[in-house]
Design a protein with these regions (language model features):
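Predominantly a Rossmann-like dinucleotide-binding segment in NAD(P)-dependent oxidoreductases
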Residues: 1-143, 170-172, 177-179, 186, ...
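Glycine-centered tight beta-turn/hairpin loop motif at sheet-sheet or coil-to-beta transitions
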Residues: 157-161, 184-185
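Flexible, glycine/threonine-enriched loop-and-boundary segments that flank and lead into catalytic domains
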Residues: 137, 159-169
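Intrinsic-disorder/low-complexity loop/linker signature
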Residues: 139-140, 159, 210, 300
């Protein structure tokens, strides 16, 4: 069985070379990583009531929710998991999470590394977030379960921080990038989306060309294509290839951050693992003829996060 999970940045040759340099000590000890995905609403992150959209008004509710999957936490983890996982995962990679071939996923921290301090995924998250705008320009209410801005501080067992900033609001400053800071230098590994990825290292704290100590030496290939090339090569040549655990671990990091923002609480790794289910009735889902795992209120709205009020689950 060969399993790819769609984290295409992990297949970037430029990022891979940079991750190796960082693990060799090129910027000293890693102390901080920053990731940003801030732009206007995209895909199905914003939804108005089903009955207000002619193309959806006659669909079964479950089918509509799947069509608008970014709007529902049960269906996708919301825009947080679907959008931000790539930036967050590539930062964890630079820290050393799941280095090497796809079979080396990271696993349990004590079993694999022997010491919790060397666990290269975050163990805690605290976050803020909210929904600034509750209606579109036509005055129609948004009924999705997403916030339109998130700020998350992840903490590693050794004290390293990963800061992530996400926003889906029109008219604001846009940034789509990831950076890493060490005791001896600074690095950039995405600057304007997931590709191209101008991976480079510098002395100091800024990407000053005069202080550049390394950059990816080859012509960069497209990681969206590379992930397929790698999977198909494994299939054709029967190479070990299973990204499932690594993808699950990256998803769990996202779950921690999203839950921290939606509940207003600090969330530890085990808290996220043992949290109340996102959709208590999901196991009863039998198809498009059954009830949706989350049901609309009379006005078409859905249960939404209430930080500080709903503390033990997200909605």
């Amino acid at each position: 069985l060969k399993v790819g999970v769609g984290l295409m940045c992990r297949h970037s040759r430029a990022r891979g070379a940079m991750a190796d340099k960082i693990q060799e000590g090129a910027i000293g000890d890693v102390v901080l990583m920053r990731s940003y995905r801030m732009h206007g609403p995209v895909a199905s992150a914003r939804s108005i009531p089903q009955k207000m959209r002619n193309e959806y008004k006659d669909l079964e509710e479950i089918r509509w929710q799947i069509r608008r999957f970014h709007s529902f936490i049960w269906a996708s983890g919301g825009c947080f998991n679907d959008y931000y996982i790539h930036n967050i995962d590539e930062c964890c990679w630079m820290k050393g999470a799941a280095m090497g071939d796809p079979e080396h996923t990271g696993g349990d921290p004590l079993n694999v590394m022997g010491s919790l301090e060397k666990w290269s995924w975050p163990i805690m998250a605290q976050a803020t977030g909210g929904k600034h705008y509750t209606k579109n320009k036509q005055g129609q209410p948004y009924v999705d379960q997403n916030f339109d801005n998130y700020s998350v501080e992840y903490t590693y067992a050794d004290g390293t921080k990963l800061m992530h900033y996400g926003r889906t609001i029109e008219g604001c400053h846009n940034e789509f990038a990831s950076y890493i800071h060490g005791t001896k230098g600074f690095g950039t590994f995405s600057k304007n989306g997931h590709w191209p990825a101008p991976s480079a290292l510098y002395t100091g704290l800024t990407p000053n060309p005069k202080n550049q100590t390394w950059k990816f030496p080859a012509r960069e290939t497209n990681p969206y294509q590379d992930e397929w090339d790698d999977l198909l090569d494994a299939i054709r040549n029967d190479k070990p290839y299973n990204e499932a655990e690594r993808g699950a671990l990256a998803s769990q990091v996202c779950n921690m951050g999203r839950m921290a923002a939606h509940t207003g609480q600090k969330v530890m790794w085990d808290d996220a693992l043992n949290a109340d289910p996102l959709a208590p009735d999901l196991e009863n889902l039998v198809g498009f003829d059954g009830d949706a795992p989350v049901k609309a209120n009379a006005d078409g709205s859905y249960p939404a996060p209430q930080p500080g009020i709903t503390k033990n689950r997200e909605y």
